[in-house]
Each structure stands twice: as C-alpha cells, then as structure tokens.
Amino acid sequence: MKIILFLTLIALATCELYHYQECVRGTTVLLKEPCPSGTYEGNSPFHPLADNKFALTCSSTHFAFACADGTRHTYQLRARSVSPKLFIRQEEVYQELYSPLFLIVAALVFIILCFTIKRKTE
C-alpha cells in the first residue's frame, strides 16, 4: 500500500500528461496547445497557428510541451499508411417499409382478405 502511495505521489509530482493521436501519413494534424506560453520540445516541424493551435505533418513522432507551471504534455502521433475508412463503401442494404413492392404486396393481401371475409359472411 505504501509503495502505491509513493508511486502516485511521484506521478503527481512530475505532472506529465500524455496525449495520443492517430493520423494518416502525409496529412497535417491540427492540435490545440495545452498552455499558451509553452516551450516546444521535439524534432518535428512545428507550425503555430491562431487560437493556441498548432499544425504538424503526420508521421510517427514524439514531442512535448513544457508549460510555465511545470506541467509537461507529451504527445505521441501514430501515422498509418492508409485510413481504414477511406476506401470502405457505405452500402446500407435495407428495404424501406414504404417501398413500391411492399405497398403492392400489402394492397393485394388486403384485397384478398376483403374478398375472403365477404365470402364467409354470405
């Protein structure tokens, strides 16, 4: 129990937060800066933008921001060669309730039922 408390105390003292992002290789990733006056620590080209955002080219990379309050935000980008949703065809094969075929069949069943009920009552 004391070991768990000690490890928790060490983790809180370092104040290191981790952020993970998946992206398609070669695209640009838009991320929000964790703190406005942070120091960038990394080897990837970093492009600061308005509203405390920044852009990075997607590649498998590891970088960090060190904030003035001592908090360190570590980012891990994981690049994929192809997006899995890029080439998937969205074919939803389902039949609507009010399709013409359904309406024709329903009308025929209704007419047949009307005639059979009428014959039974005679």
UniProtKB/Swiss-Prot annotation:
It is a single-pass membrane protein; Single-pass type I membrane protein. GO terms for cellular component: host cell endoplasmic reticulum membrane; host cell endoplasmic reticulum-Golgi intermediate compartment membrane; host cell Golgi membrane; membrane; virion component. A motif (Di-lysine motif) lies at residues 118-122. Residues 118-122 are intravirion. InterPro entries: ORF7a_SARS-CoV-like (IPR014888), ORF7a_SARS-CoV-like_X4e (IPR044871), ORF7a_sf_CoV (IPR036495). Residues 16-96 are virion surface. It is found in: Virion; Host endoplasmic reticulum membrane; Host endoplasmic reticulum-Golgi intermediate compartment membrane; Host Golgi apparatus membrane. The di-lysine motif confers endoplasmic reticulum localization for type I membrane proteins. It comes from the Viruses. This is Protein 7a. Keywords: Disulfide bond, G0/G1 host cell cycle checkpoint dysregulation by virus, Host endoplasmic reticulum, Host Golgi apparatus, Host membrane, Host-virus interaction, Membrane, Modulation of host cell cycle by virus, Signal, Transmembrane, Transmembrane helix, Virion. SUPFAM superfamilies: Accessory protein X4 (ORF8, ORF7a). Interacts with the spike glycoprotein, M protein, E protein and the accessory protein 3. The chain crosses the membrane at residues 97-117. GO terms for biological process: symbiont-mediated perturbation of host cell cycle G0/G1 transition checkpoint; symbiont-mediated perturbation of host cell cycle progression. Residues 16-81 form the X4e domain. It comes from Bat coronavirus HKU3 (BtCoV). Its main location: virion. Disulfide bonds join 23-58, 35-67. Bat coronavirus HKU3 is highly similar to SARS-CoV (SARS-like). Non-structural protein which is dispensable for virus replication in cell culture. It holds the Pfam family bCoV_NS7A. Residues 1-15 form the signal peptide.
